[in-house]
Amino acid sequence: MWKLLLVALAFALADAQFQPGKVYRYSYDAFSISGLPEPGVNRAGLSGEMKIEIHGHTHNQATLKITQVNLKYFLGPWPSDSFYPLTAGYDHFIQQLEVPVRFDYSAGRIGDIYAPPQVTDTAVNIVRGILNLFQLSLKKNQQTFELQETGVEGICQTTYVVQEGYRTNEMAVVKTKDLNNCDHKVYKTMGTAYAERCPTCQKMNKNLRSTAVYNYAIFDEPSGYIIKSAHSEEIQQLSVFDIKEGNVVIESRQKLILEGIQSAPAASQAASLQNRGGLMYKFPSSAITKMSSLFVTKGKNLESEIHTVLKHLVENNQLSVHEDAPAKFLRLTAFLRNVDAGVLQSIWHKLHQQKDYRRWILDAVPAMATSEALLFLKRTLASEQLTSAEATQIVYSTLSNQQATRESLSYARELLHTSFIRNRPILRKTAVLGYGSLVFRYCANTVSCPDELLQPLHDLLSQSSDRADEEEIVLALKALGNAGQPNSIKKIQRFLPGQGKSLDEYSTRVQAEAIMALRNIAKRDPRKVQEIVLPIFLNVAIKSELRIRSCIVFFESKPSVALVSMVAVRLRREPNLQVASFVYSQMRSLSRSSNPEFRDVAAACSVAIKMLGSKLDRLGCRYSKAVHVDTFNARTMAGVSADYFRINSPSGPLPRAVAAKIRGQGMGYASDIVEFGLRAEGLQELLYRGSQEQDAYGTALDRQTLLRSGQARSHVSSIHDTLRKLSDWKSVPEERPLASGYVKVHGQEVVFAELDKKMMQRISQLWHSARSHHAAAQEQIRAVVSKLEQGMDVLLTKGYVVSEVRYMQPVCIGIPMDLNLLVSGVTTNRANLHASFSQSLPADMKLADLLATNIELRVAATTSMSQHAVAIMGLTTDLAKAGMQTHYKTSAGLGVNGKIEMNARESNFKASLKPFQQKTVVVLSTMESIVFVRDPSGSRILPVLPPKMTLDKGLISQQQQQPHHQQQPHQHGQDQARAAYQRPWASHEFSPAEQKQIHDIMTARPVMRRKQHCSKSAALSSKVCFSARLRNAAFIRNALLYKITGDYVSKVYVQPTSSKAQIQKVELELQAGPQAAEKVIRMVELVAKASKKSKKNSTITEEGVGETIISQLKKILSSDKDKDAKKPPGSSSSSSSSSSSSSSSSSSDKSGKKTPRQGSTVNLAAKRASKKQRGKDSSSSSSSSSSSSDSSKSPHKHGGAKRQHAGHGAPHLGPQSHSSSSSSSSSSSSSSASKSFSTVKPPMTRKPRPARSSSSSSSSDSSSSSSSSSSSSSSSSSSSSSSSESKSLEWLAVKDVNQSAFYNFKYVPQRKPQTSRRHTPASSSSSSSSSSSSSSSSSSSDSDMTVSAESFEKHSKPKVVIVLRAVRADGKQQGLQTTLYYGLTSNGLPKAKIVAVELSDLSVWKLCAKFRLSAHMKAKAAIGWGKNCQQYRAMLEASTGNLQSHPAARVDIKWGRLPSSLQRAKNALLENKAPVIASKLEMEIMPKKNQKHQVSVILAAMTPRRMNIIVKLPKVTYFQQGILLPFTFPSPRFWDRPEGSQSDSLPAQIASAFSGIVQDPVASACELNEQSLTTFNGAFFNYDMPESCYHVLAQECSSRPPFIVLIKLDSERRISLELQLDDKKVKIVSRNDIRVDGEKVPLRRLSQKNQYGFLVLDAGVHLLLKYKDLRVSFNSSSVQVWVPSSLKGQTCGLCGRNDDELVTEMRMPNLEVAKDFTSFAHSWIAPDETCGGACALSRQTVHKESTSVISGSRENCYSTEPIMRCPATCSASRSVPVSVAMHCLPAESEAISLAMSEGRPFSLSGKSEDLVTEMEAHVSCVA
């Protein structure tokens, strides 16, 4: 090293130094200016002129003295304008600059700098900028060389080029610096700790590029080199978007010229000098938080300023947000940052009693981001001056925004131990998580985080672990995850799966949190995290959820291609499909990423996907999935990505855990924006089991009551005895929380909550407490009512800083460049409430008294918000600031002034609202780009774009440039100021081409663009308008940055359409109950009066129409008793109404009138068609049955089926025109009357078109399927003795699908079940008659769905009426009336209709919507709107049925004429979007024309877990087979209800269907016989069962299992069964030997409802035991067990865990996985005194001698798990080989051998496995 240094010194030139006793005098000019790079636009900057004297003291030291300081600023068009002096407030700063400063100088390099302590850092930094010009590293005989050189900006890459001058003693040196290539760069950041650098993004586009060029002229003197002149130019270029889209620059220049060298005596030395460091720039300690580019705080009385700003905020934000409120709030924040804790505490003590001031102070303290804010918070909490709500808000906000320093971390630690926080759990969680985030921000820019900062979190983790407090462990792990430091890895590893004593030492929840805590650590040390999580993923013995979570962390750490390929190779033989599906889906989605951040991972995953192939791509949504989608825009260099993780549970469709994350990329950085997560493992069990457990008959059993009895205790103890007999039993840890969720912001967890038993108990306690304190609740209600009567005034304001991002780095002149983004906002909500009551309320008022009165509430409310975003690029110092600034302001506000009336007794609600009476701006957005200069004398600003500029006039006129809302700028017109300083680089330096470009730009005028669009509302006599005005810099360059630079104003406003207010108020009235009809009749009477008034001028007479309306409305208002009294016996109300309407129709027809006007409720064309049809059908009305039969056959005779497909128009959605005769039975007449009334000719059609019904459209399919339906029903009736249990087993079976039949798409709708009868000729005719009548009723059902029918209104009272009315000054009716009718069909199923009409009597617009639910889960909905509900029509029909004998559901959407907008949307969806969606879903296509104007979707359940889908569009059919469902399709028994059965209500049926899906009712089955075993997961094993020993076949794995199924094989090879069911012990040997609690009970007694709570049914060969959800089928040779899917993963025993995990199928009671099946089966033997009698088998540790492979010595090896062996007095008659793990000890170790010989118990469980060998396990023993 020393040799290299000597060689370097040998090549160095003579030292550049200052000779002692000489003074070197220089003139120095420097400036820095910011703005757009093009000439002609306005820029802003700072400049300085001064004289410099350098006195040489020794060869290595000199003194610099500054004189004649002249500070200036620039504000105007560049380069034509000049600099102007800064005068006011700079005297003290200039005095500091003129203080002499000493510095070390050796071999051309600047060393340490010494200055008096009173000299500020800003002055010393300017001295550094001057000395930076003297930093030279020249080498002898080298003209070009590179090195890392120290400068003001840091230690950066520097290139030297040395050229000889014209004279012998002169040389020219050019030095360039790449400021983006630095070993140590000087910069400061704020608000970017959570942002991660994106190296690949920076390679594509460097957002901040910096470079500097220095030109030197040097004299070569014998005494050394002297700098004659030096010029520097530095460019800082910021590209917000892609570099081609424009950039903003900061240009800095320095000029140093030698004026002379004189001899002078040595200068006097300062009394005390302090070492201020080297040449690199030094930021003040609080510069990042206290140096704001927006405000100048130096020299101000800050306490007075704070009071002034607070007063402005309080007084001007009472009703709505003031437009300057966000800026004022930022000013308040800036002032508070510059005061100490004492001043802040003084302000609080003065104002905290005033609630308005209190709110603003508490909002501003978190935005301070200084340690004084934490100190203030600590003192305020200690004095308990905050409420819990205020404390939670301010603690979270303060810790989230806090600038991380050692001082703030110390205060935060003290904050955690305050009693106020410790005693509030929610607040404590917030504080602990916030402390972890604060540590993360502090250590973000350090190599290693100090241990003392993490010690509080490590202590919390250790202490909670010692106490086994799971909640505290989770909190500590989450806080360490927020901190994200590699120092915590060892602490976290203890809780990772596979790292402790066993895999299940901690609960799954704790292990999952430990894995996820590594996510932030992976950002700092990805390789270490990969080494930890990869073994977890590869370990198949670990639970699938934990392996999946490790995979999430693994891919977030951005692994290499090699590691991803390793995962892919392991995935080829992955036995766990949940893990395989998740990892494959994650790699597949990542491989499609186009975001540069994921470029390397995407390439690695693309290779891995090719290795795996498409085998795993066929796994459906039943399995866990990961989805990653992203987008990236190259122009803006910004993107967004989203991740969705779903970890499925084998126990049902509800996932075990879900998480979603949104991540953003921009400016070369990436950050997690927000993340939500939910874990709900216990939620499905809660939904399935409910609050009470059901016995075999559905009766609720109270388990606690049973356990209180002595008999129950004895049997519970019996269960525990059985558990103790199992070797090393460990109950599976219960997942205590039912659900838990969390929210992360910027990768930091800010809040998490859990719903567990404790939380449920708290909620229950609060509920019971509220009920028990009923009097207190009534008192609170009375207090609120009293306040409302007096009038309540509520004001809520909130000020906030959304984002504050700053980046500061020095420029060459020694002042910092500041990039700043600030987003702040203020919201105000104010409401004035005043209530009045129709009657005075009693003093002891109750809620019932309040509801019995008519309440009138007057409301005057306003809500408003204003948001202010500021982006700055400029220069900032304590005194002066200059730069370019863009403001974006948005304000929105809305006021409400109205009245609410409510009468609960009469079910009436009415609200009125006053409309806008004048122009009201709702949303206002402005954007302004300016250049500014701020100093203590004021603020000067100019727009970036001058209105017009020429070269002849050097300056923009004051009238054009001066802003109207700022202080008076410096007078540019003063000639002496203009001539004070002229640029040394004048315009003659530009080439002619450059001057022409300058002239073109400066003489151009930016264009003002305007745009306005309004949408008028005639109903409200107002219009909503959007207007915009834009003036940008796109005329200079067509780039994105220039398009958003300039001035922009847009607003959304509401304005009345006329000067006179036509609408006085808008009313909304809702009436329900019996009074609803009154609202309808009032509206109709108005229409009737208007129609009578217009009769005189109308050519169309309407005789009898008004009388008909009034008679119908009177009938509506008549009571139900009157209608029942008038109703003849045996007739229905519908028939009487039908006949009434029919007679009315005929009388109207006889009058010979023309079609009535469109506002009436009767259509005469329908009546004529009905009359004509009745006359045509009267000849064939001999009997109702024949008439009905003929009616059903008529469509086929007249070619109706052909017209179904040949029609070229819209399908007719109404009934058939061939209705049955009016002389039929009452139901028939009702049907025909309904049809005749509803058959309305649409207004847009000229010629009537034959109608079709849904029954006729599928008549061929129906007839072809009727025979198969009847045959299937007959076969089912012949085997009616089979139980419902067998039906469910048939449903579980997987049937083969006939592929050719599937492509026919023959869907058979569900039919009514036929009554079982003998098939005789008579019955056959009867059957046909029934079929025809069924068809007729089907047609009638279709006719009910015609939207134009009015029969519903005639037969039913309206249930709800909603009237939206505009009260006009001219008294005209304007608004909308909506009427809701609902009732029940003849089958007791719901039907409903909604009718909406306009209130204007001149309007014919109407909307009709009908809904009906028919039997067998068939629903129809139709809607029509427009002219008399007939202009536009659509219908939806949903039904259940069969597709090739598989249960299916079908949804049909039909439409007629549609509005043009809907028509375009429909065409775009069907023709453009549908093929794309089908292609993404990989659906097959069949070019097949289907019905026009109809879309059909058929879903068929081929198996309980697989579904086929068919989508029929008018021109094509899409289908897909074998779609794997995440849930189990409900059993067909759900809709196979007999017609006459007592079915549940509709809500109960829907709840049952949903419950069937959520509960996933497909049971898991396990079967065992004497030779083999098939587990719940379907694994098959051959097993030679030991005799006379009980095996645990199946049980629920918990500390108190509700059931245990035990089996035993006797000496005759017969199986006996024993069950322990909660409080019962059942033993079954045969059908004649059944014992309950030792008492023999006959089978017939157990086959019916009994006191034991279970059933035993005789199923022929088998006995079937039913207990709750458990089913056990038994005979002497085999046993079958069915458990519900709610026990997925919660069973154990020989039948396995029931978790679909075949690799871990052989889990023993100690949760270890057995080496072979025999060892697994033997581990579940419960040996007792009956296990072999005197020669009973028992578990014994076996011994084997072995020789050590390494040392060759003898060892004694013992089995780690005992195996089945006979006693020493007996010998084995049968044995089987088993694999045994051995633990070996030296031969001289005799402790275990002695224990074995003495028969003392010992265990080697958990010891290391040194040897695995095969040994004999005994099966039976003989004496």
UniProtKB/Swiss-Prot annotation:
Q: In which tissues is it expressed?
A: Produced by the liver, secreted into the blood and then sequestered by receptor mediated endocytosis into growing oocytes, where it is generally cleaved, giving rise to the respective yolk components lipovitellins 1 and 2.
SS bond partners: C1566-C1695, C1589-C1731
**Superkingdom of origin organism:** Eukaryota
This protein's name = Vitellogenin
| N-terminal signal peptide | 1-14
Q: Pfam families given for it? A: Vit_b-sht_shell, Vit_open_b-sht, Vitellogenin_N, VWD
Does the record bear Signal in its keywords?
A: yes
Record's function text: Precursor of the major egg-yolk proteins that are sources of nutrients during early development of oviparous organisms.
Q: Which residues carry this modification: Pyrrolidone carboxylic acid?
A: Q17
Residues modified by carbohydrate are N1097, N1298, N1675
SMART domains in the record, alphabetically?
Answer: DUF1943 (SM01169), DUF1944 (SM01170), LPD_N (SM00638), VWD (SM00216)
Domain Vitellogenin span(s) in chain numbering: 18-658
What species is given as this protein's source? Answer: Ichthyomyzon unicuspis
The protein's UniProt keywords, in alphabetical order, are: Disulfide bond, Glycoprotein, Phosphoprotein, Pyrrolidone carboxylic acid, Signal, Storage protein
Q: Which ranges are annotated Basic residues under compositional bias?
A: 1194-1206
Q: One MF term in GO for this entry?
A: lipid transporter activity
Q: PTM details?
A: What corresponds to phosvitin in other species is lost during maturation of vitellogenin to lipovitellin.
Do you know which InterPro entries this protein is assigned to?
Lipid_transp_b-sht_shell, Lipovitellin_superhlx_dom, Vitellinogen_b-sht_N, Vitellinogen_b-sht_shell, Vitellinogen_b-sht_shell_sf, Vitellinogen_open_b-sht, Vitellinogen_open_b-sht_sub1, Vitellogenin/Apolipophorin
Here the segments flagged for biased composition (Low complexity) are 958-976, 1128-1149, 1178-1192, 1217-1238, 1253-1286, 1323-1344
